[in-house]
Amino acid sequence: VGSEMCIRDRASTDPALRKEYTNKGFWVNIRLIRYADVLLMGAESANEKGIPGEAIDYLEQVRARARGTNSNILPKVTTTDQGELREAIRDERRVELGLEFDRFYDLVRWGIAKEVLHAAGKTNYQDKNALLPLPQTEIDKSKGVLVQNPDYQ
């Protein structure tokens, strides 16, 4: 009465995502980030802040779930050396999150993307690939606050 109503005749979301709605249109709890990822971020942060005990606690929570009851599968990480612990955390991220498409961004964040990718025979990586271009519309809206990332100007 006095207003128009538009009903879409097709869905624009992924069918798997549409299954996550209840019959009342509310979201069901969709997992956007895994708890193991959160724990590994905590481990990395604690290690970089020089708190190895906390880093090991986070790391061991992830490894304990993976090892189950067989402690021979994954021995406990006991090193408190920051460099060694950093490598253990990085390796755990590699195996725990291996098929979740975060590896490249981890390598970039750690500043080792070129080294690791070239060692794996992926020689088309360039330093400019560490950053993505900013959308020009966002740069324009910022009125000079944002500038385009290097190599994309």
Task: Go through each PLM region and give its residues.
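Acidic/polar-rich alpha-helix caps and helix-coil junctions
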Residues: 3-4, 8-153
